[in-house]
Design a protein with these regions (language model features):
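Short secondary-structure boundary segments
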Residues: 13, 71, 98
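C-terminal helix-cap and adjacent tail motif
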Residues: 27, 91-127
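Alpha-helical transmembrane segments of helical membrane proteins, especially in multi-pass transport
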Residues: 51-52
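Short hydrophobic alpha-helices that are characteristic scaffold elements of the AMP-binding
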Residues: 57-61
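GST superfamily/GST-like fold recognition
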Residues: 43, 62-77
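Glycine/small-residue-rich phosphate/adenosyl-binding loop
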Residues: 1-48
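Short, conserved aromatic-histidine micro-motifs
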Residues: 78-96
Length: 127
């Protein structure tokens, strides 16, 4: 029922905006404005991801259902349809609507796996 959601939004990041900002005089000495490969972590992706999480949490907070999903096919068609500038990086999509009553038989295989223990995913001091 994912594609039946009344709202499906596309999430994009703009690496060019970060290059422009870090080319300004107060940031130029970092050399992060030179090219995207200068960034050890692509913060345009990080920031777009955090903003998406905030959107998901806000939707839930007002009683809506929301989920993030990847766009694995059809990106070229989406870009053409919505006239997306070439420098924009597609992160994924968000579906927002009304939550369905949960039916455990409809859940995917990953939802049926037992949760890992905190000790399996949290590290203290070292790996």
């Amino acid at each position: 029922h994912l594609l039946d959601a009344p709202v499906i939004g596309l999430v994009f990041a703009d690496p060019h905006a970060y290059l422009e900002r870090y080319s300004e005089p107060d940031k130029a000495k970092t050399k992060l404005g030179d090219e995207t490969s200068a960034w050890p972590t692509p913060y345009w992706t990080v920031d777009a991801s955090f903003a998406t999480m905030q959107l998901l949490l806000a939707a839930h907070d007002v009683g809506l259902g929301a989920l993030f999903f990847g766009v694995f096919n059809g990106e070229d068609e989406l870009r053409k349809e919505f006239k997306v500038p070439v420098q924009m990086q597609l992160i994924g999509a968000v579906a927002i609507g009304w939550p369905m009553l949960e039916n455990l038989t409809d859940r995917g295989a990953s939802a049926k796996r037992p949760r890992r223990k905190p000790s399996e995913i949290i590290r203290e001091g070292s790996f």
